[in-house]
Swiss-Prot record:
GO terms for molecular function: trans-aconitate 2-methyltransferase activity. Catalyzes the S-adenosylmethionine monomethyl esterification of trans-aconitate. It comes from Azoarcus sp. (strain BH72). Disulfide bonds: none annotated. It is found in: Cytoplasm. NCBIfam families: PRK01683.1 (NF002463). CDD domains: AdoMet_MTases. GO terms for cellular component: cytoplasm. It comes from the Bacteria. It catalyses: trans-aconitate + S-adenosyl-L-methionine = (E)-3-(methoxycarbonyl)pent-2-enedioate + S-adenosyl-L-homocysteine. This is Trans-aconitate 2-methyltransferase. Its main location: cytoplasm. Belongs to the methyltransferase superfamily. Tam family.
């Protein structure tokens, strides 16, 4: 996974949290003793879990010390844990594993997702949301913006395209008593092309910037923004629509 910048990520905190709210709304769990926010980031999604289950033990897990620093400041009552998300396991079964916008960074879903289901108590819930934007212009341009950096961009540790929703259904259905999947495209309203670049600098663009020398960033970002400007033209009020598709799944063990 790339190195994270909590302040860059939080520039669009409300917009990033919207999908977490929509995912949480479909979690069929009235009472919970222990809930885990896996890939909690700076705690914006964790706050939703605290609000819904104020008496529960809430645990936030992330690989980034920078993200956890912000999370601890915002929610000191939560248990925070720095861990490799690929190897994390609870000491005992939990009621909810909530993974909002993190699993797309982790490999081998065929092994990882059934294993997460096994960490739930009977009746527990695994709730996952993943951006599905590998083929969107914003992400295609990250890989294809022409320049002297092309060879290094090809080796960036970026996300891979997600399998189809049907693949996830076939993977999880044998292990779940109830399974719901859906996809939504959020038509996010952005002020201009620069705002779209600022959005992706907090997430998907980070591996590509890390693959380049710092003195190459301005030229690459300028070329990338020119591509974004063409791919997302102004609407009638001058602002841009930034379609952002996401895949959701809620599995009950």
């Amino acid at each position: 996974m790339p190195t994270w910048d909590d302040q860059q990520y939080l520039k669009f905190a409300d917009e990033r949290t919207r999908a977490a709210r929509d995912l949480l709304a479909r979690v069929p769990l009235d009472d919970a003793a222990t809930v885990v926010d896996l890939g909690c980031g700076p705690g914006n999604s964790t706050a939703l879990l605290v609000e819904r289950w104020p008496q529960a033990r809430v645990v936030g897990v992330d690989s980034s010390a920078e993200m956890l620093r912000s999370a601890r400041q915002a929610l000191p009552q939560v248990e925070w844990m720095q861990a490799d998300l690929r190897a994390w396991a609870p000491a005992a079964p939990v009621d909810l594993i909530f993974a909002n916008a993190v699993m797309q960074w982790l490999p081998d879903h065929a092994t990882l997702l059934p294993e997460l289901l096994r960490h739930l108590r009977p009746g527990g819930v695994l709730a996952i949301q993943m951006p599905r934007n590998y083929d969107e212009p914003s992400h295609r341009l990250m890989r294809e913006t022409p320049g002297p950096w092309a060879a290094r961009l090809a080796g960036a540790r970026a996300i891979a395209p997600l399998p189809a929703a049907a693949w996830y259904y076939d993977l999880l259905a044998p292990h779940a008593r109830q399974l719901e999947l859906w996809q939504t495209t959020y038509e996010q309203v952005m002020d201009d092309a620069g705002a779209i670049v600022e959005w992706v600098r907090g997430t998907g663009l980070r591996p590509y910037l890390e693959a380049l020398a710092e003195d190459e960033h301005p030229a690459y970002l300028a070329a990338y923004e020119a591509g974004i400007d063409a791919a997302y033209p102004p609407r009638s009020d001058g602002r841009r629509l930034f379609p952002f598709p996401r895949l959701f799944m809620v599995a009950v063990r």
